[in-house]
Amino acid sequence: MNEIISTTILLILIMDPLGNLPIFMTILKKLDAKRRRIVVIREMIIALIVMLIFLFVGEKILTILNLKTETVSISGGIILFLIAIKMIFPSDEGNNGTSSEEEPFLVPLAIPLVAGPSLLATLMLLSHQYLHHMPYLVGSLLIAWFFTIIILLLSGLFLKLFGDKGVNALERLMGLILIMLSTQMFLDGIKAWFKN
């Protein structure tokens, strides 16, 4: 039971729903509330599928493709860095490079914001550590996923509270934080790569 609680808390912290909330708000701010909910649910379902795949066969996929976990970390850092630059210096098309009529699909919401390299690597490590307790791992993942989706579905409420200017300010602030996180993720991948 303690393992389930600690694993669930670990997964929630890595998914970081509160940290991702301003990014989700920024990317989805031009969509109406109903469409925003649909997109959040769709992206979270995609993220859950990816997480379950990595939990069960992640290491095998990387082995088949001859990729190391460091590669996942480095590439995730690069993607997040590019997203952060667009958040700090938004173009007329919007911060995610789509027009106001378009909406994100798969990248960047499902991957790498929710199902990011850190989470996918953690799931692979947990699947080795608790090889004979897979039902508990799946349960922990589902609880953490449910907690995250509830917080992200409340993004509309936060949009009403902060308004457009508040969201723009949060966007730039989160962009700065995201640049630091992505750089750290990239450097961790490089460091691990050199160690191996």
Curated annotation (Swiss-Prot):
Record's bilayer topology term: Multi-pass membrane protein
InterPro entries in UniProt: Multi_antbiot-R_MarC
Subcellular location: Cell membrane
Main location: membrane
Keyword Membrane appears in the UniProt entry: yes
Record protein name field: UPF0056 membrane protein BUsg_434
Keywords from the named record: Cell membrane, Membrane, Transmembrane, Transmembrane helix
NCBIfam families with a match to the protein in the record: NAAT family transporter (TIGR00427), PRK10739.1 (NF008010)
Family note: Belongs to the UPF0056 (MarC) family.
GO cellular component terms, A-Z: plasma membrane
Spans traversing the lipid bilayer: 8-28, 45-65, 71-91, 105-125, 134-154, 174-194
Presence of the UniProt keyword Cell membrane in the record: yes
Highest taxon in the source lineage: Bacteria
